[in-house]
Amino acid sequence: YITLEMAEEKIAERIDANLLNVNIQDITDLPKPMFDSRVTNLAQKTQGSLIIKEYPTASAHSGHFRALLQDLFLKKSFTPDIIFIDYLNICASSRYKAGSNVNSYSYIKAIAEELRGLAVETNLPIVSATQTTRSGFGSSDVDLTDTSESFGLPATADLMFALISTEELEGLNQIMVKQLKNRYNDPTINKRFVVGIDRSKMRLYDCEQSAQNDILDNGQEEEYNADEKKLKKSFEGFKY
């Protein structure tokens, strides 16, 4: 996990709250015996390694990340399965110097291309984030044109989705995910779906299927017939 925004310790607190099932504001007050017990129980379920590395905002680019991966491999024999970068727009570019006379479209596009190149080179998925424009910030139906600063970013990404929150969804402790671009599959399949969110524990979780029924896309609505064990599509009655 590479962060250019929050401190390493704050990122670790969020992950601890998720794994230990404790409200994030209670992490520092958790009694040591309870902490040890939860860590022991967690270790029995799963094993893994997480490296959190902080860089100053707008100071690190793909070259720094490549050097970090090489350093971890040589000194700790550590090779990640996935890389999270928080977040793309505040990375630097290895091709453009900071303060150079370059527009935001070209600069952000260059960062996206460099990170994608790093992903291809290392054969690792890289997940990052961006923000929306002001008009997209309050929108309940975000699309690719709402990407802030540079449309070159969605042009470069392989998979892109939006996290959408409204007052109604907040009341249900849910967040909507909308596929904006998908090079690996048909983006109209499960184009919109909701997941549960527990902000106090920094956790996402699956929702019941009934929660998905209200957001099915037109033309994609399907009804599952349990008796016949088949999917009946809403356009089944069409005649050719």
Spans of features found by a protein language model:
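Helical mechanochemical/support elements of P-loop NTPase systems and associated helical scaffolds
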Residues: 7-11, 31-35, 61-65, 84, ...
